[in-house]
UniProtKB/Swiss-Prot annotation:
Name of the encoding gene: nrdR
GO terms assigned for molecular function: ATP binding; DNA binding; zinc ion binding
Cofactor note: Binds 1 zinc ion.
Source species, domain of life: Bacteria
Keywords associated with the record: ATP-binding, DNA-binding, Metal-binding, Nucleotide-binding, Repressor, Transcription, Transcription regulation, Zinc, Zinc-finger
GO term, biological process aspect, one: negative regulation of DNA-templated transcription
Full protein name: Transcriptional repressor NrdR
Domain ATP-cone: 49-139
Stated role: Negatively regulates transcription of bacterial ribonucleotide reductase nrd genes and operons by binding to NrdR-boxes.
Organism listed in the record: Clostridium botulinum (strain 657 / Type Ba4)
InterPro entries according to UniProt: ATP-cone_dom, NrdR-like_N, RNR_NrdR-like
PROSITE patterns assigned: ATP_CONE
Protein family according to the UniProt entry: Belongs to the NrdR family.
Keyword Cytoplasm attached: no
Length: 151
């Protein structure tokens, strides 16, 4: 790897450790020419995942899009950013464990709803209303009744 300061091609690793989530390795390097230090990250290369949308079009999986949708559902609710990130992690873990290269939005929505229901029922109903495309108040009432029956 070339030094970002002098572009020399050789360096030594001074320190190496896993990142907090264990998904990559952080390395402190020292250039053998200019002796300046810099940080690099080593991460497993993954195959891009395609999401099959309801209209059968495909787009690349976008974690940020999923997190933003969750944040809207959880707005002004007692759900932390960390909990939202954990749900997103669970979706990614599920896709990765099943070694899927394509996944439909139904599967993603089911995983999100299963996890969101455990955290906050109001956020769950909000998310479900968009995901399942509730058409009227009766659909909301039906979902709320199902939640209450299970409790």
């Amino acid at each position: 790897m070339k030094c970002p300061y002098c572009a020399y091609g050789e360096s030594k690793v001074v320190d190496s450790r896993s990142t907090e989530d264990g998904s990559s390795i952080r390395r402190r390097r020292e250039c053998l020419k200019c002796n300046r230090r810099y940080t690099t990250y080593e991460k497993i290369e993954t195959t891009p995942i395609l999401v099959i949308k309801k209209n059968m079009s495909r787009e690349y999986f976008d974690r940020n899009k999923m997190v933003n949708g969750l944040m809207k559902a959880c707005q002004k609710r007692p759900v932390s950013r960390k909990q939202i990130e954990q749900i997103a992690d669970e979706v990614e873990r599920h896709i990765s464990n099943e070694m899927l290269t394509e996944v439909n939005t139904d599967k993603i929505g089911q995983i999100i709803m299963k996890n969101l229901k455990k955290i906050d029922e109001v956020s769950y109903v909000r998310f479900a209303s968009v995901y399942r495309q509730f058409k009227d108040i009766n659909t909301f009432m039906e979902e709320i009744k199902n939640l209450m029956d299970k409790n």
